[in-house]
Structure formats: structure tokens, C-alpha cells
């Protein structure tokens, strides 16, 4: 996963890592780990940054070179994400077990995502979007 856009957008806005860390209520060290790729940014913080910079998640994650953000605000809703994940999986005729195997996780994890009990991990959402050519903004 490439988070080069985190750096580019921060610099475009003439901000320092500590400024973004304060905005997200995290440490500068944590933010630095996201920028250099040592840690993956959680979906809720990714969402906050996309809203702050007024960019799409697809653009932020490098899944698209076009920023097709509609000037609205994204919200993370576990139930909607779960429903869309399930719809996508069924459209592609993929079982929960197959998707779990692809993501190197468990069937129960996929079930928890689809039922809206747990927010999908950024890395899993990214892998699904990249592998199956769907929009992160849709999920």
C-alpha cells in the first residue's frame, strides 16, 4: 500500500506532521509511521484525512489518479460497508471462506465485517479494491 499522497497533500497544504497529528488527536510519531509505510492508517483516520483534504479515498490510496470527490463528506458506517462487501462478494460468486483465504484471515472475520459488527481493516479493504477493481469510496 502506498501512502505517498499523505505526504503530498500535507505538503500541498503547507502542514507539518505535528499539525495533522493534532487534527487527528494522535501522536506525531504515529502519523510519521503512516507516512513512511511502517504502519497502516486506520480507516477512520483515513476517512478524516480525505474529508479534511477534500479528496476521495481512491485518490488518497493511489487506486485512482483522478480526484473525483463530490465535495461531500464521507462517513464510516460499519453496517453499510458490511452490506456492500456482502453484495460485492455475492456478485462475484465468492464465498466468505474464499474471500477470507484471499485476505489471509478467517471466515469469522469476514462474517463480522459483513454483519457490521466490525469495521473492515484498511489493508483488507485496499486489497479487495485492488484485486477486484472496485472503488474504496463505494465500500
Language model segments and positions:
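DNA major-groove recognition helix of helix-turn-helix/homeodomain DNA-binding modules
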Residues: 25, 44-59, 123-138
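Short amphipathic recognition helices of helix-turn-helix/homeodomain-type DNA-binding modules
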Residues: 59-69, 138-139
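Residues that mark the N-terminal boundary/hinge immediately upstream of a DNA-recognition element
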Residues: 5, 16, 42-45, 56, ...
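Alpha-helical residues within the helix-turn-helix
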Residues: 11, 22, 51, 90, ...
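A short, Lys/Arg-rich alpha-helix, primarily the initiator
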Residues: 1-12, 68-91
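Short alpha-helical DNA-recognition segment
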Residues: 14-32, 36, 93-112
Amino acid at each position: 500500500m502506498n501512502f505517498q499522497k499523505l505526504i503530498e497533500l500535507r505538503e500541498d497544504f503547507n502542514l507539518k506532521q505535528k499539525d495533522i497529528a493534532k487534527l487527528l488527536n494522535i501522536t506525531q510519531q504515529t502519523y510519521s509511521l503512516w507516512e513512511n509505510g511502517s504502519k497502516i492508517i486506520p480507516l477512520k483516520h483515513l476517512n478524516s484525512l480525505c474529508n479534511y483534504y477534500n479528496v476521495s479515498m481512491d485518490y488518497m490510496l493511489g487506486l485512482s489518479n483522478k480526484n473525483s470527490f463530490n465535495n461531500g463528506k464521507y462517513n464510516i458506517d460499519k453496517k453499510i460497508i458490511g452490506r456492500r462487501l456482502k453484495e460485492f462478494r455475492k456478485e462475484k460468486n465468492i464465498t466468505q471462506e474464499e474471500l477470507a483465504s484471499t485476505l489471509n484471515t478467517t471466515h469469522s472475520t469476514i462474517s463480522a465485517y459483513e454483519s457490521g459488527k466490525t469495521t473492515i481493516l484498511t489493508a483488507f479493504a485496499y486489497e479487495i479494491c485492488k484485486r477486484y477493481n472496485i472503488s474504496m469510496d463505494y465500500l
